[in-house]
Amino acid sequence: MRLSGKVAVVTGAGSGMGRSTALLFAREGATVVGSDINAANLEAVTAEATAAGGKMIGVLGNIAKREDAEALIQRAIDDYGQLDVLVNNAGIMDAMEGVANFKDETFERVMGVNLYGPFVTCRAAVKHMKERGKGAIVNVASVAGVSGAAAGAVYTASKHALIGLSRNTAYAYAPFGVRCNTLIVGGVETAIMAGADPAKFDHEALAQYGKWHAVNPRTLQPDEVAKLSLFLVSDEASGVNGAEVAVDGGWTAAC
């Protein structure tokens, strides 16, 4: 198992890509500390991981709040004495507002989850990882982080900035054995694509959206993203640092 003996924190673990990542990491031998704002979802994925023979605990919290983000990292260290892996997966979309009409509350909410939360968790994690001389971080961004659009100004800006955080972290902490990479994710079949309301998820519309932008005419599944996260945090990717790695079905081929 590729993560045997390692402790991994996964944010947004209650659904979508985070859920798939937490379950896969647990199957690969990691002790998973999963965080989510949705108690029912977090309880369900924790139970599923445990029932399958894995090790996972759930920590309820809002990653956009400094105290919750810091407590999450500290919980892993306090309970298990180490932190080997951090996956900043939690993310939300805006109302697809352009720069001329975005709302202040939208900016604060989206930047809080998509950027401030990862800043705080990275800050807490790298201090511990530096002392241990090893660690791996994956920040989950988006094709919006390497391209532009007429709408979604705040979301796009948050993902561009997240890539900057990853690069800076990789450069600063490489001498101490800490790696940090970014996943560039395309259209994935998750609740975030429907405003976090699964009942509104339009599979056909999302598939068509993907066709306009990608070589691969289908939406991706959360498991496909999780598998790449697994590779990036494993020892197999020991030479990969400060990189943006796309799992987008070919979307960025046109960028």
Question: Where do the PLM segments sit?
Answer:
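Substrate-binding pocket helix/loop in short-chain dehydrogenase/reductase
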Residues: E97-V99, K103-E108, Y209-G210
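A conserved structural motif in NAD(P)-dependent oxidoreductases
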Residues: A214-V225
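Active-site helix of classical SDR
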Residues: C122, S158, S166
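Residue(s) in the substrate-gating loop at a strand-loop-helix junction
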Residues: S142
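Short C-terminal tail/terminal secondary-structure segment
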Residues: M93-M96, S147, K211, L230, ...
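Conserved glycine-rich cofactor-binding loop
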Residues: V7, G14-G16
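Short, small/polar-rich loop/turn modules that mediate ligand/substrate recognition or access, typified
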Residues: A174, R179, V240-G242
